[in-house]
């Protein structure tokens, strides 16, 4: 057994190093330390058998073999038939004879003796070997320090004074009370960031400052930062060195040093922390002070934003540039309804007036910025055209309107600025549907037309603000009762009873008389002849694209003649009792869009305008029996 083989073989670090340098075929090196220690640093090409209590108990009970404990990469060496030398090491064992019988290393050695012919223990363990031959050790690289502000301090017991800047030192109470050390470094100013640390006897009161705070999570260090920075700058102006210290030089004094770097070097709190940490790795401000450093960083950014341009005094807004004498004021775009009041106020404060009046008192910075922004507002011609292309909508309720003495020359294009419209023609039940009467905007409007109370008047032509959507409603009830129903067939639905005809059976005409559905080769278009067939017309009738020209009027006359035929030849519907009920409620809703027309043509150019327009419409005719 292994316990009978005494004394046990040993191997020193030099011999193991020579064997490892010999290349492949060397001894099997077993690391008996914990997995954490092995993973951090271990001998080159060694394998680990973790020294846990569970592994120790299972080895003692014989429930696990050495081959099962060794990593798969080195298992081939264990299972080899050729003789294999084994070297075992722990952390620092120098003499195997002093090992306890129940120790993990003793149990492991006894089990290895049963599997291998030559088992030796490394003298001095890994500590001796790594110090003599660090190049023959390997492991994962040391983890980088976390880059956050809350990284822990390194275990440096005593680092002494640390020079952060040529005139700034960081230290502890022990360093400050060492007069020789202070004199050697030429330090004559002391900033004490504690309540309990005494003042050095060799430092005068004028060169000593105390920040009475404790290192806990309730102290407020932020109010003292500016005073501390002024004290450090005072020492710098005197060409002297200053030391900032607390009890250990880790938390409170380090916070003040970080704040000084932030203020003087323009660094962020994170960068300033790393700057000081690189020079004194033991610093570790508590989270309370770290949070106050973040608040101090925000205050510095706010101060820099308020100061703005270095050439402009802080707190004094730069006055807006005033135009030269006799020079015209910059033209402002037409104010909208939302900015009219603001624009007027800005215009009153915009500098010298044309009469040479003195400028108004300086306005607050926000008002000056608003005035400059308003002066720079300009709308391009494309934006103006896009504004004019917005849809407008209005509705007309028409019973009948006819003015024989008034005859327009022809329908013309809409007024400038009045772009594509949404038209809705709606007549109540029992009223005749005819051509719409001129709108109040048209010069041919009938004088007897009376607007409905809810109609919104059109804004004056000179008004700069115009709503993109207009609503208009007209009621011609009185005109319908005073004027005859003649010449209203231009927009009447085909097949309806003509003027002056009694309603007979089958008053509704078949849909074959209706205008054809618009198609690519026969789209909707305007009909000038139909427009001239009635008085007081605002909108031209619509027909097929093949109809414009002289043929359009002849088609309408043929439809009039067809409607003039006796109605008794048609059967199917009972006769209407009264002329007032001949025409029933009909609705027509049309929506069309058209581009802006540069040259406003009249009369003969209407057909070309209709071809340029894109039209979509729907007609619904309801006959109530």
UniProtKB/Swiss-Prot annotation:
Keywords: Cytoplasm, Hydrolase, Nucleus, Protein phosphatase. Disulfide bonds: none annotated. Abundant in brain, heart and skeletal muscle. SUPFAM superfamilies: (Phosphotyrosine protein) phosphatases II, Rhodanese/Cell cycle control phosphatase. Residues 380-389, 555-570 have a biased composition (Basic and acidic residues). Its main location: cytoplasm. It is found in: Cytoplasm; Nucleus. GO terms for cellular component: cytoplasm; nucleus. Its EC number is 3.1.3.16, 3.1.3.48. Residues 431-448 have a biased composition (Low complexity). Residues 306-586 are annotated as: Disordered. It catalyses: O-phospho-L-tyrosyl-[protein] + H2O = L-tyrosyl-[protein] + phosphate; O-phospho-L-seryl-[protein] + H2O = L-seryl-[protein] + phosphate; O-phospho-L-threonyl-[protein] + H2O = L-threonyl-[protein] + phosphate. It holds the Pfam family DSPc. Residues 160-302 form the Tyrosine-protein phosphatase domain. Residues 23-138 form the Rhodanese domain. The active site is at residue 246. GO terms for molecular function: MAP kinase tyrosine phosphatase activity; MAP kinase tyrosine/serine/threonine phosphatase activity; phosphatase activity; protein serine/threonine phosphatase activity; protein tyrosine/threonine phosphatase activity. GO terms for biological process: dephosphorylation; negative regulation of MAPK cascade; signal transduction. Has phosphatase activity with synthetic phosphatase substrates and negatively regulates mitogen-activated protein kinase activity, presumably by catalysing their dephosphorylation. Expected to display protein phosphatase activity toward phosphotyrosine, phosphoserine and phosphothreonine residues. Monomer. Belongs to the protein-tyrosine phosphatase family. Non-receptor class dual specificity subfamily. This is Dual specificity protein phosphatase 8.
């Amino acid at each position: 057994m292994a316990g009978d083989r005494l004394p046990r073989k040993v191997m020193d670090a030099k011999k193991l190093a020579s064997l490892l340098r010999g290349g492949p075929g060397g001894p099997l090196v077993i690391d008996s330390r914990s997995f954490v220690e092995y993973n951090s640093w271990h001998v080159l090409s060694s394998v680990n058998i973790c020294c846990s209590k569970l592994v120790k108990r299972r080895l003692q009970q014989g429930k696990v073999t050495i081959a099962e404990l060794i990593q798969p990469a080195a298992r081939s060496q264990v299972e080899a038939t050729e003789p294999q030398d084994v070297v075992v090491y722990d952390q620092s064992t120098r003499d195997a004879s002093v090992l306890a019988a129940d120790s993990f290393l003793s149990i492991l050695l006894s089990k290895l003796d049963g599997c291998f012919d030559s088992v030796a223990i490394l003298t001095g363990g890994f500590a001796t070997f790594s110090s003599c031959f660090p190049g023959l050790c390997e492991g994962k690289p040391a983890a980088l320090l976390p880059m956050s502000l809350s990284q822990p301090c390194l275990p440096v017991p005593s680092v002494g004074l640390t020079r952060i800047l040529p005139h700034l030192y960081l230290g502890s109470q022990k360093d400050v009370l060492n007069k020789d050390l202070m004199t050697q470094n030429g330090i004559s100013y002391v900033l004490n960031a504690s309540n309990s640390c005494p003042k050095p006897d060799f430092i005068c009161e004028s060169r000593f400052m105390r920040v009475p705070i404790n290192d806990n999570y309730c102290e407020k260090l932020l109010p003292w930062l500016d005073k501390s920075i002024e004290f450090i700058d005072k020492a710098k102006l005197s060409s002297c060195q200053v030391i900032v210290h607390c009890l250990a030089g880790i938390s409170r004094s380090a916070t003040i040093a970080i704040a000084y770097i932030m203020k003087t070097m323009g660094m962020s709190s994170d960068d300033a922390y790393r700057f000081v940490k690189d020079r004194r790795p033991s610093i570790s401000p508590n989270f309370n002070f770290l949070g106050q450093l973040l608040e101090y960083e925000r205050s510095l950014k706010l101060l820099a934003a308020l100061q703005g341009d270095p050439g402009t005094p802080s707190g004094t807004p730069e006055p807006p540039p005033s135009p030269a004498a006799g020079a015209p004021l910059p033209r402002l775009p037409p104010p909208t309804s939302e900015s009219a009041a603001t624009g007027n106020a800005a215009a009153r404060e915009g500098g010298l007036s044309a009469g040479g009046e003195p400028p108004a008192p300086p306005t607050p910075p926000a008002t000056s910025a608003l005035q400059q922004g308003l002066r720079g507002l300009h709308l391009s011609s494309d934006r103006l055209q896009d504004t004019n292309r917005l849809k407008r909508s209005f509705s007309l309720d028409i019973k009948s309107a006819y003015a024989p003495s008034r005859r327009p020359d022809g329908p013309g294009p809409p007024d400038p600025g009045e772009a594509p419209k949404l038209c809705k023609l709606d007549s109540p039940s029992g009223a005749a549907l005819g051509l719409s009467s001129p709108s109040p905007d048209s010069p041919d409007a009938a004088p007897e037309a009376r607007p409905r109370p809810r109609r919104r008047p059109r804004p004056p032509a000179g008004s700069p603000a115009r709503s993109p959507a207009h609503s208009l409603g007209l009621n011609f009830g009185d005109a319908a009762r005073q004027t005859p129903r003649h010449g209203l067939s231009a927009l009447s639905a085909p097949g309806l009873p003509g003027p002056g005809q009694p309603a007979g059976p089958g008053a509704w005409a078949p849909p074959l008389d209706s205008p054809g559905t618009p198609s690519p080769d026969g789209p909707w278009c305007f009909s000038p002849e139909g427009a001239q067939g009635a008085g007081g017309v605002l909108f031209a009738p619509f027909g097929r694209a093949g109809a414009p020209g002289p043929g359009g009027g002849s088609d309408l006359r043929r439809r009039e003649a067809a409607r003039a035929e006796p109605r008794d030849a048609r059967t199917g519907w009972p006769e209407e009792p009264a002329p007032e009920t001949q025409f029933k409620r009909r609705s027509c809703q049309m929506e069309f869009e058209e581009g802006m027309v540069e040259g406003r043509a009249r009369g003969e150019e209407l057909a070309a305008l209709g071809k340029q327009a894109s039209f979509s419409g729907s007609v619904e005719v309801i006959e109530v029996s």
